[in-house]
Amino acid sequence: VSEIVVYVRSQPQLGDQIVALPTLYQLKTWWSSKRIKVVARDDVGSFYRALPWVDEFVRASTFGDYLRSLKKETGVCVSLHHSSERFGLINLLRLPAIRLGFRNARISDLIWTHCHRKNTAEYIGQANLRLLASYRPFDPERAARECFQALARPHLRTAQRADVVMIPGGGAGAFKRWSLANYVRLADRLKQLLGNGTRFLFVLGRQEATERDALEAMHRPDFAIAHCRPIPELSAVMLHARLVVANDCGPSHIAQGACAPYVGIFNEPNPEWFWQRPRSAAVVPRRPEDGIDTITPDDVLGACRKVLEHHAHIAYAG
């Protein structure tokens, strides 16, 4: 194996990049001396170039660009695209020895040497790792956690600490945003459950200026803000937390990948973006057509209680 080429999905959102991180980590774990080249359509080079496991980033816009990115001497090609025939054809023309891709009842299914069936009911980050496991078995959950532990390592002693991390963002629009007012009500209920000394950290991005102003105006000593913090620092924050509660947004996938006790709040069931595990829970409106803010703080509190009880039981048992 001389070089590993990874075609990431043609999606510019932060969450789409974060769910690819454990895949890149695992590839570098297997082949530490080999170059990893990430190829993408979108302008996401700054994200991937900052990673310790990526040696080169190539932005491609045409079929020719993609084809040139896969050299004849490339030993491994991993396609994280779910349905494009383009990447099967590129692999057919270049024929790297190891060709990994998703099966989805297309003719390109025949081209992969190792594959995993695409299923929209499976968390996308888990699916990426199961694709790799078709080549060599490993524990996807352990690999994901180790990935974010590796990113977090420089920040583990200095990152902000909180019992509960709350992520009220939602870059896709208001329909994905359970309101800040609801998060504050939930925080008050969680204090009754966890104790008056419970500390909360709100993770905010550029789009949450209104939420930032509102939180600062509250002057609550139990509330802190992490604004526009880098992914390695947020990884350390999530790994320290007793609980993470989040809307369906990019940073939520740091918490899910880090295997933190997690409650996700969704406007509708969205299993492709929620990693279903015993220490995680998804909350959706009883009638999705009524909108995300019909979810009450008590609805979310019930999910938090279940996740916390399971996590405490596992911690005690271990």
Please provide the spans of the model-predicted regions.
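Catalytic machinery of carbohydrate-active enzymes
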Residues: 1-318
